[in-house]
């Protein structure tokens, strides 16, 4: 069975954890910004279907 030869240092572990947390923070910030733009109506990247009125009746 494969095992690591040496223990990973706390510094390396913390560095990897910080990178992971930074990516999660960036994703959360992007999602929040996108949600705000959708709610305010300033979103340019979405196509909303136009509700057509029933004129056949």
From Swiss-Prot:
The protein's matches in InterPro entries, at most eight in alphabetical order, are given as:
Ribosomal_bL32, Ribosomal_bL32_plant/cyanobact, Ribosomal_zn-bd
In what ranges is there compositional bias, type Basic residues? Answer: 1-20
Residue ranges of the region described as Disordered: 1-23
A single Gene Ontology biological process assigned to it is: translation
Q: Which keywords does this Swiss-Prot/TrEMBL entry list? A: Ribonucleoprotein, Ribosomal protein
What are the disulfide bonds?
A: none
GO molecular function terms here? structural constituent of ribosome
Q: What GO CC terms are in its UniProt record?
A: large ribosomal subunit
- Homology family: Belongs to the bacterial ribosomal protein bL32 family.
For this entry, the protein name equals Large ribosomal subunit protein bL32
The opening ranks of the lineage are: Bacteria, Bacillati, Cyanobacteriota, Cyanophyceae, Synechococcales
Q: Which gene encodes it?
A: rpmF
